[in-house]
Structures are given as C-alpha cells and as structure tokens.
Amino acid sequence: MNFVVIIPVRFFSTRFPGKALADINGKPMIVRVMENALDSGANKVIIATDSSCIARVIESEQSESEVCLTRSTHQSGTERLAEVAINYKFSDDQIIVHLQGDEPLLSSTMIRQVASILCSMSSTISMATLATPLSSFKEARDDNVVKVVINMNSNALYFSRSMIPWNTGDFVNHLDSKFSKTLLRHIGIYAYRVKFLRRYIAWTKSPLEQIEHLEQLRVLWHGEAIHVSVIDDVFNISVDTPESLSRVNTVFKKNKYATVHN
C-alpha cells in the first residue's frame, strides 16, 4: 500500500502557543509525532509548517522525514496539507494521511489503518477517519474532545465539541451503557486522495466549520461523505492545553510509549 503522511503544524496555536515544541519526556512533541509516522510504513513523511523554528528542529533530527515550508495564511491544517500535496505534484489518486501535530499518542498502527481503510473504499467516499467509544461522562462534556455521530453505513452525520447525541433523561450525570456503541469520540487523523484535496481548497469555509472550529465540517457541508471506522480500546490524548500535555508526559514516563524510540 502506497501512502504519504503529512503533518501540518504551526507554532502559534490559538489555544496553546508553542505546543509543537513542548517537551514530552525529553523530545519535542512534533518529533514524537514524526517518529510514529516514520514507523507506519509510509512511503514519505512530510512536516508542513510555516515556522522556521519547527523546521530547524525537524532537520536537526536527521531522520528520513522531509520539511516543507508553507504559507502562513492557511486557516486549517487541511489547507496547509493541500499546499504541500499539490506542490509535490502527487498523482490525483495518491493517498495522503493527515496526522495532526498535537497527537503524540496516535500509534503507527492507527496511521496505517486509516490509510488502509480509504484504500479499500469506493471512490464515492472522500475521506476516512477513526473514532472510539467515549470512556466517561467527563470526557463527553469536555469541549476539547470532539464527538461524532455516524449513520448505518458508518459515514459521519456530524462532528461537534458538544455532547452528541444527547438524551435529557439518561445523560444527566452519566453515560447510559446501552448507547456505548453510539457515543463516539473522534480520533484526529484523516486519509484522503489528492483529487479530493483539490476540491476541498476550492470550497468556501462553511458556517458550521466556523462555529465549531472543526475543519472536517466543510466536507459534510458540501455534501461529501466521511467514512468513520470505530475501533475499541484506544488510549489517546490530544495536546490542546498545558493540562493535557502534563497527562501525556505522565503516559510517557510510565513507559507505555516512550520505550519505542529511546
């Protein structure tokens, strides 16, 4: 299977500036993410950034990854990624995995899995992504945790930072276990083909995308399908705040992931 991983990353994150270079058990976060991508078996790994600081850090690693400096005007990671895919002149059918730079716990297995899912789908599916059952009521109410609702064909109906779906009677203080397969947390990784990216950047930004600050809503707004594969027993923490960074460091210090590259 031929796929390329592109990691769009900027230094001045709105919620947590500088997080890309935040230390995770002795290495910058972006390096941790890059290492997982390199372990996935991707044909190429590219870090797409508008930051010379981030570029220097990646280049100092002397790894097999590449750095592509992009424009600073992009409104989303997908827009930044699309610039790279087009500049590299990848073929229209080339599969691109969008790995977010704040996902240091996303394993190489999951990276390869999302590429494999899209590879097996018909061309009517524009994107593939992953989700896992919500683990707690606290997680469900956390607006840093993105939720997704899917239909009977496992295609996304909607993504939100709010709790969806919501039951005013059953979800007051806990999650009803009978809905465990319906209450899903989105995992921030995508796969798409280059020809889809060309369409994406031509679309206007959708109102839903602007309200939720979720770039994948542009795809649903414009009527295209996102396939969601649900996987169980996924432990993942996105680094959105200093608090979540601390939790990720705790994980690495317990050697759940850190031993891979030491």
UniProtKB/Swiss-Prot annotation:
Q: Which GO terms describe its biological process?
A: CMP-keto-3-deoxy-D-manno-octulosonic acid biosynthetic process; lipopolysaccharide biosynthetic process
The record ties this protein, via Pfam families, to: CTP_transf_3
> Which keywords describe this protein according to UniProt?
Cytoplasm, Lipopolysaccharide biosynthesis, Nucleotidyltransferase, Transferase
Broad class of the protein's primary localization: cytoplasm
**Localization in the cell:** Cytoplasm
Q: What Enzyme Commission number(s) apply to this enzyme?
A: 2.7.7.38
Q: What molecular function does GO assign, one term?
A: 3-deoxy-manno-octulosonate cytidylyltransferase activity
Q: Which Gene3D superfamilies match?
A: Spore Coat Polysaccharide Biosynthesis Protein SpsA, Chain A (3.90.550.10)
Q: Which reaction does it catalyse?
A: 3-deoxy-alpha-D-manno-oct-2-ulosonate + CTP = CMP-3-deoxy-beta-D-manno-octulosonate + diphosphate
Cystine pairs annotated here are: none
Q: Which GO terms describe its cellular component?
A: cytosol
Q: In which pathway does it act?
A: Nucleotide-sugar biosynthesis; CMP-3-deoxy-D-manno-octulosonate biosynthesis; CMP-3-deoxy-D-manno-octulosonate from 3-deoxy-D-manno-octulosonate and CTP: step 1/1; Bacterial outer membrane biogenesis; lipopolysaccharide biosynthesis
**Membrane in keyword set:** no
What this protein is reported to do is described as: Activates KDO (a required 8-carbon sugar) for incorporation into bacterial lipopolysaccharide in Gram-negative bacteria.
Stated family: Belongs to the KdsB family.
- Report the protein name in the record: 3-deoxy-manno-octulosonate cytidylyltransferase
